[in-house]
Amino acid sequence: MCAGFYVAVHPWLEAQSLHKVGHTGNLAARLHDGSYTTCFTDEWKYCFTLETSTKKDAQKIEAGVLYCAQFFRVKNKELVCLLPEKIKQLAEDVANCLDISYTLCDSPTYEMNDSTIVVEPSLPSDPLISKEKLRHLVITPVEDEEHFADDVLFFSTDETRTAIEDRLYQKEAANMGYQELRRSGRAILQMACRCGKTRVAYLILSNYLQGKVLYLVPGLSLLRQTLEKLYQYGISLKNVLLVGSDQTRIVLNHDNIEMTTNPVFIAKRIREAPSLLVIATYQSSTLLVDDFDLIISDECHRICGEWETRPFTHVLLNFKKGHRLFLTATPRYDTPLSMKNRELFGGVAFRYYLREGIEAGYVNDFELQMVAAPKLAHQPSNREETTKQIIVKQIIMALAYLKTNIPAPKMLVFTRDIKQARELYAELVDQGVYALIAHSTLPRQVILKTFTEFCSSKEPVILLNCRLFQEGVEVPELNAVFFAAPRHSPRDIIQSICRPLNKQVQKPHATIFLPLEVNTENVCLDRFSSIIPFADALASEDPRFYEHLLNPSEVAYPINWIGAHGSVSELLQLARHAIRYGTQGKIDRLTRSERLPWKAAFAELKRTVEICCRYPKINDGFHFGGATLRFDTWYKWVIKSYLQYKNKEPSSLEPYQVSDLESLQDWTTRGVGGPYPWEESMAFLETWLAQNKGELVAIDIHQGGWIGLDATPMERLSGVLTTVSQRDGRSYGKNKKLRPKKGFMIPPQQAEDLDRIFGKHNLKWRKDRVNGFLKEDEHGNYTGEPTCIQEAYRTFKEYVKTNPEYIEKYWPGYAKGKHKHQELPHIWESGLAPPRYKAFKDGNKQLIQRSPKKKDIKN
């Protein structure tokens, strides 16, 4: 008898890419016992075995393999969805880690006779194995397939060192990222695909090269690519350590370097080296020790997921030292462990939109083509078959559209799952379409061969996949992507869109195809529900698309419809309506304050501050993408979020937005506190009364606020007392004869301040009341004794005529017209002031451009 660990396969399981792992004390008899022959035919065979001296050793290997392949195991079964070569390597690694001697046998056959049929003694179901020893062997889940692609597809770039000129936004990103690291120890750089995040990371890590830097990447190919780029930028290989499972030597110019997974060597090198750059895969991060000054996590959205320790979260959750820099184009916020966690990830220190990269010429532009559902000659008997035939025809329509402009177009088709990819592939091939298919259950050599064939094809070709080529794979000649199934994750959508956006000389714009089950015979908003997540994701990366959705007549966008049976313009209008208002068509989803593109809204705020010398007023309007918006609503949201951020509360603002705000003149005083600072004005009032023997002298409370950033203390006091007078002029209680009013609205603390300051000088500031109501005549005119504030205004009106020196000193440039209180005269005259927002009873909203009257212009 021969004991051992085995991997067996049966045709029924092999069709699903499943393999049976197990252990036995009798390899010759195992595949002939009842558990194998009762439910299956006798077509079992061993892929390989590890013969061991005892059954207990074989059981330990099985337990170790199932632990390390836990993410690929069928629940409660000893079935693993991995290629035999991968399981073989894993089994040998487990045996070596557990110090178990074995003999490897590939595709063995064992002779079966009566002497081999022996009843095996039972063993404990859960053998004791050191999971700590095996933790570094745990295989990362392939739930999104792109991790698989990282290790399969790698195309070397030119590794020669060349002078590189940093782009302006890269310098800005590096500066803001480094400053945020110094301030809080953590920073996120959110930059669109293909905009040079690695270069920015290099500029930042250059500040830490006297110490130890860890650069984490999600796969072996990206590790090589990162090394090559850093080498081009000037990094010396003598201070570089590569941690990964590929033993192939990497040759760069005349230098060369190898990867390692030796935990003893890795720990010793990290601890003893005074300065070191470690580039490692997340999968190998459990081999590292916590001794770094800076940790860079590339494609950090892949860290997010369940709140548990796994290779991708190991460093994030267990390492305590060093600053943390996170790089991504698509942050992930929809998981238990998400990038909303400021303690772990920090905030976004720099943001660079996809549209910015396109307009700057670094990213290829693209168009959107929605593909209508074609009419079928024969209606299938079930819904699933109908959908499949419709999508096949839509793919063929999309390819035909590409061929009108490109001789040999290449199109990636993203499917819902591998099953759908196989079904579509079979249908397309049957219809004579040159189609290829790749998925993670295929051998690596097959995937690489398929991908190479796709890239080098001189004919129109389609490559079907689920998520294998969604991230990290460069296809310079790719012309289009087609979504054969809805995507709901913004990360998946943006990453997929970016696949064909490589910038190349004379390369035509890319095309994004969105199939819809819509035609003119049966149109309703629900038919557009599948594109709403897509539109939301794109609008967050492309402000131009956002503006187009608000008003397509003012902002053009390359979006069209192919295969429509009726009016294209009407279908596009319905699609835009569904995106903006949802399939119920009720709530405007786009004009919420938090959804306004930050750079555009902040630019208007900055313009108002720098040109108009003030912050927004309540009735300021904002013209964006043809939409009429109330700017004050967004401004109040900004102030609220800013205060939450400064108080270390959950906030919608990111560090780069806070930095923008704090760059504005007097932001923390006038921007946040408003034009009428209460405490500052009360201190000025108290000093004034003390110096002038209790005489308030002259205050203008009639024309409204003094809101300019250059306002004098007396002008600001006028604004404060104007507000006091207005609020004190409101009755409280119920009175049927008068229109209901809001009541006595001066806050108690402010009333106490006024009582204290005016009381010292026996000045009356409150209006007279009877039973809580103002003393008024039948016309609503106040009939009580004048307050000191009202008397001060009468004095002011006299001073305007008789005391110009006083007016010029405390109200410099004062004009009779009210425009002085709102804008500087030249701003008013030139029409640079923000337009006035007005909402009418019928729901209509307008922006009314402020224009001066002749009497408002001071000669």
Swiss-Prot record:
EC number: 3.6.4.-
The entry's keywords: ATP-binding, Helicase, Hydrolase, Nucleotide-binding
Family matches, as InterPro entries: Helicase/UvrB_N, Helicase_ATP-bd, Helicase_C-like, Helicase_Restrict-Modif_Enz, P-loop_NTPase, Phage_T5_Orf172_DNA-bd
Residues binding ATP, per UniProt: M191, A192, C193, R194, C195, G196, K197, T198
Cysteine pairs bridged by disulfides in the record: none
Family: Belongs to the asfivirus helicase A859L family.
Residue positions of motif DEAH box: 298-301
Species per Swiss-Prot/TrEMBL record: African swine fever virus (strain Badajoz 1971 Vero-adapted)
Keyword set includes Secreted: no
Domain Helicase C-terminal as annotated: residue spans: 394-553
SMART domains for the chain: DEXDc
Domain Helicase ATP-binding: 178-349
Broad enzyme group: hydrolase
The protein's name in its UniProt record: Probable helicase A859L
GO molecular function, one term: helicase activity
